[in-house]
Amino acid sequence: MAASVEHRPFTSHQHGVVRSFKSYPDVPRPKKLPLPQPLSDSTNDNDEEAAVWKELVLKSSAGVEPSIFDPRDDGTSDQWIKRNASMIRLTGKHPFNAEPPLPRLMQHGFITPSPIHYVRSHGPVPHARWEDWTVEVTGLVTRPTCFTMEQLVNDFPSHEFPATLVCAGNRRKEQNMVKQSIGFNWGAGGVSTSVWRGVSLRSLLKRCGIYSRAKGALHVCFEGAEDLPGGGGSNYGTSLMREVALDPSRDIILAYMQNGELLSPDHGFPVRMIIPGFIGGRMVKWLKRIVVSNQQSQSHYHYKDNKLFPSHVDAELANEEDWWYKPEYIINEVNINSVITTPSHQEILPINSWTTQMPYSMRGYAYSGGGRKVTRVEVTLDGGETWQVCSVERLEKPNKYGKYWCWCFWSLEVEVLDILGAKEIAVRAWDEAQNTQPEKLIWNTMGMINNCWFRVKTNVCKPKKGEIGIVFEHPTQPGNQSGGWMAREKQLEKSSESNPILKKSVSSPFMNTATKSYSLSEVRRHNNRDSAWIIVNGHVYDCTRFLKDHPGGEDSILLNAGTDCTEEFEAIHSDKAKKMLEDYRIGELMTTDYTSDSSSSNNSVHGNSETTHLAPIREVALNPREKIPCKLLSKTSISHDVRLLRFALPAEDQVMGLPVGNHVFLCATVDEKLCMRAYTPTSSVDEVGFFDLVVKVYFKGVHPNFPNGGIMSQHLDSLPIGSVVDVKGPLGHIEYTGRGNFLVHGKPRFAKRLTMLAGGTGITPIYQVVQAILKDPEDRTEMYVVYANRTEDDILLKEELDEWAKKHDRLKVWYVLQANIREGWEYSVGFITESILREHVPLASPDTLALTCGPPPMIQFAVQPNLEKLGYDIQNDLLVF
């Protein structure tokens, strides 16, 4: 077997809830693991692969909390088994059928630790002793034999390789949301990957002298040890066709080790079948007998489980017409499937100047059966009209017959604004046989092998502090857990059926039939919060009533109010947004008096006044409703990935006109697509004729989560001197007006002390406020800056901040670094913690506000909870740029 995996970093995870436990005797197991000697024909490649697998197993199991005696097993026949408390039980207390939470499954990466590997059991786990266990091979063989475990380990070459196991019911709950099947509610976590070691089934059968096909040896049947009620009492059993069982390319083994350890009780100790590329239901656990026969297994479970019937066949019809015994409906090989794991269910993506700087990385898994390679994975944001091809991380090599047994991981970088305009995200995969996933769910009575497009719905939300965000919703949640868009829509359907008025409103969308025409000059007058009109493709829309609900905030509309914004709207909005826009159409643009936006607009700060009768007022460059062209004057490399860019304003005597705390959009066409990113200038707002930007360049191929790097930052870095970029603004909901006063969403706030927490490039709006305060000698506002970065080289504007802190007592600056700490570093190491904040920022008080800008995880997991511990009301006293 030539399967192999490559190095992959594994992230930590949240521990499950540890419950109190009782003491029960452990199952008797040998003191020493049955580690076979290296094969005589082993190669250095095999040794290297084994070392890689060992490393992967160790990394994947790091941080897994000890299994416990779960109180839910009290009083059951499984009360002697320790289990991981995080596993989601799907069939109540007993029998134990469980899957891990999907985020937990993915956090461990390619190899799934045994304690969180999904479990499928039909009854109680048999008690087993290694020393006493035998596997009988009988039936149509010349040498029937009972093998002990020691014989299986020592008398046969061992085979070890990674393989993905999938329950045929994976994603069944989606089917149950449409119509209840006869199966329980698997989520998308009924899949796991482990490194398995065992004895080749082919070698075992040949050792026992399997008869020829001509002598009737057509099927190889497997029987487990558990006593089950099905069929009036039986063991779990199933079978393979002879050709499959003897096929050397299929790597079928009797496995006795999982991830370098003996099998656990839930996974078949001491020995089980592993049939790569087949559904888990064919892999008999607690294996006791192998019978070569002229007919397939006669087990009740072979016939009454793991079948895929046509959609019209329900359980009653299947029983009446004996569909269970029709061989064409048996499920053997796994089908093609893929799932979105990031974004996770109920994950919130804030929309702000930080999150729009970099694309969002979507992730998930994909697999196929029969050894077929997953050749591509695609994601759509527009219901399948267009598809984007994902990057696929394939961590195994094929075996010598070219077969793949493991899942792969896919990722795709998506612009945040594209997600904002999407109604849903869907994924599909393809394999080398050109199999792909159907768009729509195909219901069947057992709820088996559901593999329709995995869809994640997007909804606009308003997280804390009134920000706009996107909340993601998976179709279902496993077991009896509530949640998921399918459950919500099902409930809405029930409500509409019971309420004729609601049903009519749901099924009869509003149709706007306005045909009135407006002149451009009339549209231009509607350019404020009280009346915000826009022009898109010659149509006039009144967006006033949508201001408060717009996902990007009202400023995004007000920037364009009174103008023709066709280009910008088309660049960043999806088909969903375009359809929504129709509800706000009030008429058409008259073409008879059309002139260009700039020809008749008055951009002067004096408006239509006679300027000769007014005191001199310096011209402001920014116009919220227009892009202004700005030429690149200079470019200075501060470090290997940080640039100081100076841009000229359109006129030498202009100031930028950017309120302190606001930002601007830089607009450029990159690869024939409009790209817009938010930046906060570091130059003083009263500089005349220019503005400065400090830009961190995210290069391609440097950050594993963003292999393509930053589109805009790389574009800016590549610009030659003299190039022109378009700038639009101002934009932002926080404005510092001086001497402790703020306007937040237009409402006044005041503070004598400011707690200022920044991460990475999020320092720029903090820096802007600090700069404004220090320029005013009468502004006595106290500032306490805590600035977190990964390494010292990542700290932006450190010289300026340190110099200001030396000169001004009202500014305190403290740094936190995560890695590459030099000797003599005098600041904090690690992450922003409660103790760091207690030492370096003021406690909460009525005249203290907190300001923050940085990566969303920093704000969510470090800033917000630790400020709360200091007494801050993060709903009201934390301002997020």
UniProtKB/Swiss-Prot annotation:
Binding site for Mo-molybdopterin: C167
Enzyme's top EC category: oxidoreductase
Enzyme Commission no: 1.7.1.1
Reaction(s) the record says it catalyses: nitrite + NAD(+) + H2O = nitrate + NADH + H(+)
Cofactor: FAD; heme; Mo-molybdopterin
Key words of the record: Disulfide bond, FAD, Flavoprotein, Heme, Iron, Metal-binding, Molybdenum, NAD, Nitrate assimilation, Oxidoreductase
GO molecular function, one term: nitrate reductase (NADH) activity
Chaperone listed as a keyword: no
Gene Ontology biological-process annotations: nitrate assimilation; nitric oxide biosynthetic process; sulfur compound metabolic process
Residue span, Cytochrome b5 heme-binding domain: 515-590
Task performed by this protein: Nitrate reductase is a key enzyme involved in the first step of nitrate assimilation in plants, fungi and bacteria.
Oligomeric and partner information: Homodimer.
Identification of the protein by name: Nitrate reductase [NADH] 1
Species assigned in the record: Phaseolus vulgaris (Kidney bean)
Record lineage: Eukaryota, Viridiplantae, Streptophyta, Embryophyta, Tracheophyta
Underlying gene: NIA1
